[in-house]
Amino acid sequence: GGNNTYGIYGKTVNIGTNGKIKVGDNSVGIYSNGQYSSSATPTVSLASGSTIEVGKDQSVGVFTTGKNQNISSQADMKIGDNSYGYVVKGTGTKLTINTSNPVTVGNDTVFAYSTDTTGNIENRATLTSTGSKNYGIYSAGTVTNLGDINFGSGVGNVGMYSVSGGRVINGNTTIKPTITVSASDKTNKLFGIGMAAGYTDD
């Protein structure tokens, strides 16, 4: 697709192996607004070998609203500058990311963004940056990160950021991911942070 477009707009979405969605700037690869009684089974399923590629300027790879969505993604995600991989704005959402290939981002991106205070995110993807001002995971819910985050480039990169009383956990009893972040530019308030909670204007 071109700019200002939607690749798929629906409720239950399944992308099989070798499936590919590519959209341009200010666009959405997959938008789902499903309402479900439970998040027990995947409502958006992206198989291993599938690819989602989005352009720059507020594009989103997978955008979900609704209730009790269950997003299971093994897709390769390619994100343009000033854009998002996953955006969750529903309630009771479960997002599981388990892609085998590393995800590389440039500048001003957010790999996973969630305003769902009742949601859960588990990330196993390895994230790598080549630029500045990127967020790995920004969430109001519960996050478990099980993938390395290599954000050592540029300035002002943040591994995980928790808001609205959310909770972020790096690793478990068997997996111990490494978060590497960039330098800070204090003059311009661009801080390299591994994990942080809350919000400040200072």
Question: Which residue stretches match the model-derived regions?
Answer:
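Beta-strand-rich solenoid/repeat architectures in extracellular/passenger domains
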Residues: 1-4, 12-26, 41-58, 68-82, ...
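Long amphipathic alpha-helical scaffold regions
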Residues: 161-167, 180-182, 197
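Short aromatic-glycine motifs in intrinsically disordered, low-complexity regions
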Residues: 8-10, 36-40, 89-91, 114, ...
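Beta-strand repeat architectures
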Residues: 34-35, 64-68, 90-91, 165, ...
